[in-house]
């Protein structure tokens, strides 16, 4: 397992803006998509290409195109939806698989209430998207669902991650790489990431 903390200046600038207490829903939503797009760029750097011949404006040229596994984007509902448009900007043909989870506020454990996966997910690269990797419970539950469906090429894209969540995913799924804009300090007693972003779902959907 590898953890990639993306230190690109644009990523760091945008994730810092998202931490502001007075961030509007519109701005938070837009930045979630933008950082999601930048994380997708980093997470797909190793996709396989092949050469092919094509007609250019001045005759035949050699181009390159993607080959190998196609992708499916897996937003964890509901907050993962906030990153989806940004991912699809770069991968508009990707199928969308959906996993719905909520965190039990007493046990902090994930509860699955919905899942709808691409029919051929066992043949696809899965990009799980969720703004927060906090305790790691929701991420592990989603990975479990994907693996049960036969998908074994999985990457996780999160805006911010807590060290505790990273370790939990690493322990359960050492084959899954994580891409994040920031590895934050710790979880508080309520299971929220510090300094974190607050409740990303509420901020994206305007229900805070």
UniProtKB/Swiss-Prot annotation:
In terms of Pfam families, this protein maps to: UPRTase
Report activity regulation: Allosterically activated by GTP.
EC numbers listed for it are 2.4.2.9
This protein's UniProt keywords: Allosteric enzyme, Glycosyltransferase, GTP-binding, Magnesium, Nucleotide-binding, Transferase
Which cofactor is essential here? Mg(2+)
Pathway(s) where this gene product acts: Pyrimidine metabolism; UMP biosynthesis via salvage pathway; UMP from uracil: step 1/1
Say yes or no: keyword Cell inner membrane present: no
First-tier enzyme category under EC:
transferase
UniProt keyword GTP-binding present: yes
Catalytic reactions of this protein: UMP + diphosphate = 5-phospho-alpha-D-ribose 1-diphosphate + uracil
Coiled coil: which residue ranges? Answer: none
According to the record, cofactor stoichiometry and binding are noted as: Binds 1 Mg(2+) ion per subunit. The magnesium is bound as Mg-PRPP.
User: For binding uracil, which residues are annotated in this chain's numbering?
Assistant: 193, 198-200
What does this gene product do? Catalyzes the conversion of uracil and 5-phospho-alpha-D-ribose 1-diphosphate (PRPP) to UMP and diphosphate.
**Which family is annotated?**
Belongs to the UPRTase family.
Q: Specify the protein name.
A: Uracil phosphoribosyltransferase
Q: Which gene encodes it?
A: upp
